[in-house]
Design a protein with these regions (language model features):
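Class I (Rossmann-like) S-adenosyl-L-methionine-dependent methyltransferase catalytic domain
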Residues: 1-52, 56-106, 123-130, 134, ...
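A conserved beta-strand element that flanks and buttresses the S-adenosyl-L-methionine
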Residues: 115
Length: 212
């Protein structure tokens, strides 16, 4: 049953809806607001030590583009399930694009920054623990993990543009802190409001540092 649900979700994002999602991510406003968003999120990091990053579910790479303007990144990887979005991602300068689902991806490399923005909300809840482990294992010692997702104190499934079982809100940060107790520390968090001068989609973000 778990496998069936996971496959349904992966097919959903691989298919036509994933392509439409790619089109919605081409907003000029979003490109501008992302830069301001990440500057705020990374205030408490040692930016000069962030030389590499990986993003899970980057779509066409707008987050990566914004971070390239803020950080001096030498190694960048994006793991994207949708083929069309992946092809766009692969065209970005200095980006290694991987066309896989997070469930089938295993990282041998470590990165100074691991990013999930609007990604965990689309993962089958029964696969979250493994996804958390993939995120943690991809992070270098003393590296940073940044997650920006829709928040709910209790797990809840939300209809997403008329589709069921493709969007789930919950307290991702607390779950990660419980799983990786004493292995990661929460060093900053905040909220991005859709009505801000540089709007985001009402995301709650959390910045962790992995212990060395």
């Amino acid at each position: 049953m778990v496998k069936s649900l996971a496959n349904t979700q992966e097919k959903f994002w691989k298919g036509v809806f994933g392509i439409k999602y790619k089109s919605r991510n081409e907003s000029t406003i979003l490109k501008t607001s992302n830069k301001f968003f990440f500057k705020k999120c990374l205030k408490k990091t040692q930016k000069n030590k962030i030389k590499s990053m990986i993003e899970f579910g980057p779509n066409i790479g707008l987050n990566i583009i914004a971070l390239q303007k803020i950080l001096k990144l030498k190694k960048i990887r994006g793991v994207e399930i949708n083929k069309i979005a992946y092809e766009n991602l692969a065209k970005l300068k200095d980006v290694e694009a991987i066309n896989k689902s997070v469930s089938s991806y295993k990282s041998k490399n470590k990165y100074d920054l691991v990013l999930s923005k609007g990604f965990l909300i689309h993962i089958n809840p029964n696969q979250l623990n493994q996804t958390y482990k993939n995120i943690y294992n991809s992070c270098s010692a003393n590296g940073y993990i940044l997650i920006a997702e829709y928040y709910s104190p209790k797990p809840v499934a939300i209809d997403y543009r008329g589709n069921k079982n493709v969007l789930f809100k919950r307290d991702f940060a607390t779950e990660m802190l419980k799983i990786f107790k004493k292995k990661i520390n929460l060093i900053d968090y905040g909220f991005a409001y859709h009505g801000d001068k540089h709007p985001q989609d009402d995301l709650t973000w959390f910045l962790f540092k992995k212990n060395g």
